[in-house]
């Protein structure tokens, strides 16, 4: 999404993460599902496969995953995925921002985000509002849903008027 700033790409990454990548590995970690159980008559997890490409790609994806949580451009920060985490982002000379996310997502939809700039700084913070929470299961029309979640956003315990553009709610303000 760094090329376009559109949240639909992170929606798809999140869908793959929770519905495919993480579910393909057995709890013991030594078996992997190679076929889509929704599209196969019989499915099982294998300990070894003649072409073992999926397990190494899973490890590669797992290693790359933290890099998808946050992104930024020269003006502001994107919160792409909801994961308990901490990071530091340099927006420009003297604009170092510390971010901390606390959440039990996907089991609980509440996310607490702490924004701590080294000094008071104005910048837009763009928080992805997942398509599924807006009733958009898939931006390509592959899935449909009537489900919508109530979306609430607060800054310092004060409600924020949600303006969603390209899948992100933007809060442009001076952060302290």
Predicted regions, residues:
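Solvent-exposed beta-strand/loop surfaces of large extracellular or lumenal domains
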Residues: 135-173
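Aromatic (Trp/Tyr) and acidic
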Residues: 1-141, 164, 170
């Amino acid at each position: 999404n760094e090329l376009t700033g559109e949240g639909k790409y992170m929606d798809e990454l999140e869908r793959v993460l929770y519905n495919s990548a993480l579910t393909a590995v057995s709890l013991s970690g030594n078996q992997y599902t190679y076929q889509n159980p929704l599209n196969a008559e019989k499915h099982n997890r294998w300990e070894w496969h003649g072409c073992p490409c999926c397990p190494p790609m899973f490890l590669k994806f797992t290693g790359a995953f933290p890099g998808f949580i946050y992104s930024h451009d020269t003006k502001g920060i994107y919160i792409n995925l909801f994961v308990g985490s901490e990071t530091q982002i340099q927006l420009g000379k003297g604009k170092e921002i510390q971010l901390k996310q606390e959440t039990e997502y996907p089991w609980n939809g509440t996310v607490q985000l702490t924004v701590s700039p080294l000094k008071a700084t104005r910048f837009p913070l763009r928080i992805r509002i997942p398509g599924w929470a807006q009733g958009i299961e898939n931006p390509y029309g592959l899935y449909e849903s009537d489900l919508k979640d109530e979306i609430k956003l607060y800054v310092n315990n004060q409600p924020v008027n949600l303006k969603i553009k390209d899948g992100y709610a933007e809060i442009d303000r001076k952060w302290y």
